[in-house]
């Protein structure tokens, strides 16, 4: 059996889950998250915990995956997910335009407007160099953070650009001039 798949998922108070066909819907205080449930995997509520079971050994690969996705949904609707980004470089900054757009100035000839998808919120600090992305869907939060980082990935020589908070970067040594 999958070691991750056989762990039960604790359901906190105020969280309900519902399976209709091949869609799992988890509702909680922060909102609702829906996930696709592959065939051959079933969810059941036992002693206040969600238990994931599979039909046979051929579904072993997705057993742990389904458990992890449902667990992420339960944590998302109770605590939420956050991802922090840092913007490093002279003149590089981000600012919020309205509620649904982040405007980046990243050394290009034009500012870049990034529209936030529904269910995702962003906050910019006072210095405009740190960005916090929050939401209830872990996949969406990670995808938005990755797309923002891809606007100007860290440069290997000066480490300027958009990076995840706490990300360790290797700095390359530049060319040595002819003497």
Swiss-Prot record:
Key word Hydrolase present: no
A Pfam family annotated for this UniProt entry: Ribosomal_L6
An example molecular function term from Gene Ontology annotations: structural constituent of ribosome
Keywords: Ribonucleoprotein, Ribosomal protein, RNA-binding, rRNA-binding
Gene3D superfamilies named in the record: Ribosomal protein L6, alpha-beta domain (3.90.930.12)
BP terms from Gene Ontology: cytoplasmic translation
Superkingdom, taxonomy of origin: Bacteria
Lipid biosynthesis listed as a keyword: no
Gene Ontology cellular component terms for the protein in this record: cytosolic large ribosomal subunit
Annotated TM spans: none
Function: This protein binds to the 23S rRNA, and is important in its secondary structure. It is located near the subunit interface in the base of the L7/L12 stalk, and near the tRNA binding site of the peptidyltransferase center.
Quaternary organization: Part of the 50S ribosomal subunit.
PANTHER family, alphabetized: 60S/50S RIBOSOMAL PROTEIN L6/L9, LARGE RIBOSOMAL SUBUNIT PROTEIN UL6M
NCBIfam families membership: L6_bact
Family: Belongs to the universal ribosomal protein uL6 family.
Name assigned to this protein: Large ribosomal subunit protein uL6
Lineage, top ranks: Bacteria, Pseudomonadati, Acidobacteriota, Terriglobia, Terriglobales
Gene of this entry: rplF
């Amino acid at each position: 059996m999958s070691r991750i798949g056989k762990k039960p998922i604790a359901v906190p108070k105020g969280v309900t889950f519902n399976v209709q066909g091949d869609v799992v819907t988890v509702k909680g205080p922060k909102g609702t998250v829906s996930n696709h449930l592959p065939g051959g995997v079933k969810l059941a509520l036992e002693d206040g915990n969600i238990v994931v079971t599979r039909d046979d050994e051929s579904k072993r690969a997705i057993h742990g995956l389904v458990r992890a996705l449902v667990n992420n949904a339960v944590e998302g609707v109770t605590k939420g997910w956050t991802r922090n980004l840092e913007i490093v470089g002279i003149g590089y900054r981000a600012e919020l335009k309205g509620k649904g757009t982040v405007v980046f100035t990243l050394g290009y000839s034009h500012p870049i407007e990034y529209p936030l998808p529904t269910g995702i919120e962003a906050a910019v600090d006072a210095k405009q160099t740190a960005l916090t992305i929050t939401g209830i869907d872990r996949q969406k939060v990670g995808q938005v953070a990755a797309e923002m980082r891809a606007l100007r990935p860290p440069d290997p020589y000066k480490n300027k650009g958009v990076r995840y908070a706490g990300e360790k970067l290797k700095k390359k040594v530049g060319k040595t001039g002819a003497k």
